[in-house]
């Protein structure tokens, strides 16, 4: 069961929080994609329970029940996570995300090195300005982000007339959307038209406010080798930047079908926590 609450922040804003609660061996903060609501990934709930994982997440500002925060950065996610963790009495935790949510997870790890124990991300977006950032991107995806790079007014004008282009997805993506990850429809539809979508894209093309090179936690980067929305070169760049990061490219997968490997990523997170616990015990 997922419990939903609203957290009042000191500046008067609200964060809408999701929490599976209960005793857990590891807490994982989920960072949602664009545009999504923040509910933890339904297809992974049974596995999480078997692994002893507690999911905690929130709607990013401008989505769902979370107050809009103009000009937020990707790094702002660390402030949100810290506020939620403090309110729930959680000290250390792992982070996980998909697509743009992966970037927010990585920034959280970079900015909260003393609290983030491990990182697993899928189809991550590299910081803007990374070499070849637009290379290999589907035309519609590139046009949307180029509009964001021109500023809010241009991005808003673009969104007013933009239509979905099926070329951004592969056959494997559509199969995942119709089957194993049809759950995404539950979190995407309520987020369409939200100001959070524009804020997200503006954040992706501005400095994060945190350097991936500062990440000290074990990090797993998974990316579909055939991703047309955010090409795998983004995760390759991140892997070259994050100390000790593990890169797994999944052949034949696109931006959505890479989620068929999310269970492996979650299992990997739990294993990192076990390894850290074993090392600590052995040192005592």
Task: Name these PLM-found stretches.
Residues 33-46:
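The serine-hydrolase catalytic nucleophile loop
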Residues 76-94:
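Conserved acidic catalytic loop of the alpha/beta-hydrolase fold
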Residues 48-68:
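Conserved alpha/beta-hydrolase
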Residues 244-284:
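Catalytic active-site module of serine/aspartate enzymes centered on a nucleophile-bearing elbow/loop
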Residues 228-234:
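Conserved alpha/beta-hydrolase "acid-adjacent" motif
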Residues 215, 221-223, 227:
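Short beta-strand/loop motif that positions the catalytic acidic residue
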Residues 91-133:
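Conserved hydrolase catalytic core segment
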Residues 136-210:
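Alpha/beta-hydrolase
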């Amino acid at each position: 069961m997922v419990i939903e609450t609203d957290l009042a922040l000191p500046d008067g804003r609200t964060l809408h929080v999701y929490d599976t609660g209960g005793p857990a061996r590891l807490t994982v903060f989920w960072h949602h994609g664009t545009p999504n609501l923040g509910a933890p990934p339904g297809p992974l709930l049974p596995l999480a329970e078997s692994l002893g994982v507690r999911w905690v997440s929130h709607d990013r500002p401008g989505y769902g029940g979370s107050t809009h925060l103009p000009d937020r950065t990707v790094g702002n996610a660390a402030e949100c996570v810290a506020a939620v963790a403090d309110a729930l009495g959680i000290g250390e935790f792992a982070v996980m995300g998909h697509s743009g949510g992966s970037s927010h997870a990585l920034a959280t790890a970079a900015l909260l090195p003393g609290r983030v124990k491990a990182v697993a991300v899928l189809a991550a977006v590299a910081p803007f300005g990374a070499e070849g950032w637009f290379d290999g991107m589907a035309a519609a995806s590139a046009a949307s982000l180029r509009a964001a790079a021109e500023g809010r007014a241009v991005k808003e004008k673009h969104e007013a007339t933009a239509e979905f282009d099926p070329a951004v997805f592969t056959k494997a993506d559509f199969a995942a959307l119709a089957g194993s990850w049809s759950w995404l429809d539950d979190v995407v539809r309520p987020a369409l038209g939200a100001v959070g979508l524009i804020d997200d894209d503006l954040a992706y093309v501005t400095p994060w406010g945190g350097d991936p090179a500062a990440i000290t936690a074990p990090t797993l980067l998974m990316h579909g080798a055939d991703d047309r929305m955010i090409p795998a070169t983004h995760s390759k760049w991140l892997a070259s930047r994050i100390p000790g990061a593990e890169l797994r490219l999944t052949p034949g997968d696109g931006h959505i079908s890479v989620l068929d490997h999310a269970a492996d990523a979650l299992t990997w997170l739990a294993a990192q926590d076990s390894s850290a616990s074993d090392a600590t015990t052995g040192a005592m």
